[in-house]
Design a protein with these regions (language model features):
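Conserved nucleotide-sugar phosphate-binding/catalytic loop shared by glycosyltransferases and other
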Residues: 5-10, 25-75
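Conserved catalytic-core segment of nucleotide-activated headgroup transferases in glycan assembly
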Residues: 22, 164-244
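Donor nucleotide-activated moiety binding/catalytic core segment of transferases
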Residues: 63-66, 238-289, 293-294, 299
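Short N-terminal targeting/anchoring amphipathic segment
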Residues: 70-91, 271-276
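Catalytic binding pocket for nucleotide-activated donors in carbohydrate/polymer assembly enzymes
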Residues: 281-387, 395
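C-terminal alpha-helical cap of glycosyltransferases
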Residues: 367-380, 398-420
């Protein structure tokens, strides 16, 4: 069987990694893959060894012809969307074309759905406005639900949970120690990974007013929290280092560009990871790499004094730094899960009864004491670290209990009309 993977969203590794990890698990069954990816991801494909076709947003609607050429060369039995929402989003916004031109090529389309849209809903924020993702996923004969971040026991629809990746072998203690040494981490120090993405920096200047303000101002608040951590905490910024963080230079290492392999190594060398947005590739891979984490959300709509009273009642008080931050914010602060975007409906439902949330601590971003205490706990508290390690082990056991990925994929392929 031959597959064409569509993974054209640029400025991120996540979607291409989803496709590559699936292709790696299918390769032993004699299933070949050809990828269509953004130029940003060329290095990933070179390392993986799959044939590929490069695209970029300057092509606009002309991307259709480039993909048509890839289809002619690869002669796929099916087209895999890696993933559904990213495919829809990048073609609507960046390529200004109908995402479903892929139907014109003939082979059945099999979507990967990283957030289980069938059960989480289709509403999200796009360019500052509420938008509905294409509902095609609701009538697809089958789609694939990667775990993590989906629930291993996700049922009640056409989605089929599968292992997103093989659990990587942990680095040897000697290799981990050498990498930490190269990052400037001394014995007795802790390393906190702080992942960001290029599009988050872009949104500091090129987004709707509210999204732009969140993109600029949240790092200032987070930087305040991080500077309160013990002085033997070091910071590893993976991705663009956003100016507002203001972290001490003598304890900061920035890795703005990296390969997928380097990213995995950096994660494995860290003592904990902080996720400011969900879904979080770092948090998902931290489960497999056995690294604890903390993720933040804001579930409060904060508008003036009534909003402050709401926060105070919920948190037992509001810190002076948060009060000052809110006072300087130009208008109400909305709830958000995927900072600096909101995406509340989709992400909040993805988290419901999801055992992934037990593998890391959760904190409300505007609760300063909760965030700081949580970060200190995941970095330094043996009891908390052991509890989270147990939850990660349970989650990995649940992943191991899933059917073999080849079996799941072939089931989806048959339902979508592929002759197997």
């Amino acid at each position: 069987m031959r597959l064409l993977f569509m993974a054209t969203l640029g400025q991120t590794l996540h979607e291409v990694t989803l496709g590559l990890d699936l292709a790696a698990q299918l390769k032993d069954a004699g299933i070949d893959a050809h990828f269509v990816v953004d130029r940003y991801n060329k290095g990933q494909l070179d390392a993986a060894g799959h044939p590929y076709t490069l695209v970029d947003t300057s092509m606009g609607p002309g991307v259709r012809e480039v993909v048509a050429g890839a289809v002619r060369r690869a002669r796929p039995d099916a087209i895999v969307l890696s993933d559904y929402m990213a495919h829809w989003l990048t073609h609507v916004v960046n390529y200004r074309t109908d995402p479903w031109f892929v139907d014109d090529f003939g082979p059945p389309v099999i979507p990967i759905d990283s957030v289980n849209l069938e059960n989480t809903g289709l509403e999200l924020e796009l360019l500052g406005r509420p938008t509905l993702v294409s509902d095609r996923i609701l009538t697809a004969p089958a789609h694939l639900l990667p775990v993590p971040a989906n629930r291993p026991d996700a049922t009640g629809g056409r989605g089929l949970p599968y292992r997103a990746a093989r659990t990587p072998a942990p680095p040897s203690e000697a290799a981990r120690k050498e990498l930490r040494r190269s990052l400037g981490v001394r014995d007795g120090e802790r390393l906190l990974m702080l992942p960001t993405l290029p599009w988050q920096r872009i949104m500091q200047t090129q987004a709707g007013p509210l999204t732009r303000e969140l993109a600029v101002r949240v790092p200032r608040l987070v930087g305040r929290y991080l500077r309160r951590l013990p002085s033997h905490t070091r910071f590893l910024a993976v991705g663009p280092y956003l100016e507002g963080f203001g972290l001490p230079e003598d304890r900061l290492r920035v890795e703005e560009s990296y390969t997928a392999e380097r990213y995995a190594s950096l994660l494995g060398a860290s003592d904990a990871v902080l996720a400011l947005f969900l879904p979080s590739f770092a948090l998902e891979r931290a489960v497999l790499a056995d690294v604890p984490g903390l993720f933040t959300v804001n579930t409060f709509d904060v508008d003036g004094e009534p909003g402050l009273r709401l926060l105070s009642d919920a948190f037992g008080g509001v810190s002076p730094a948060v009060r000052s931050w809110l006072a300087a914010f130009p208008g109400p602060v909305p709830p958000f899960h995927m900072w600096p975007l909101r995406w509340n409906a989709v992400v909040s439902r993805l988290l419901e009864a999801n055992p992934l949330t037990t593998t890391a601590l959760r904190a409300e971003l505007l609760d300063e004491e909760s965030v700081v205490a949580g970060l200190e706990a995941v970095l330094y508290d043996p009891g908390v670290r052991d509890r989270l390690a147990g939850a990660r082990a349970d989650y990995r056991d649940a992943i191991t209990g899933l059917p073999e990925t080849v079996e799941v994929f072939l089931t989806a392929a048959r339902r979508c009309g592929v002759t197997v």
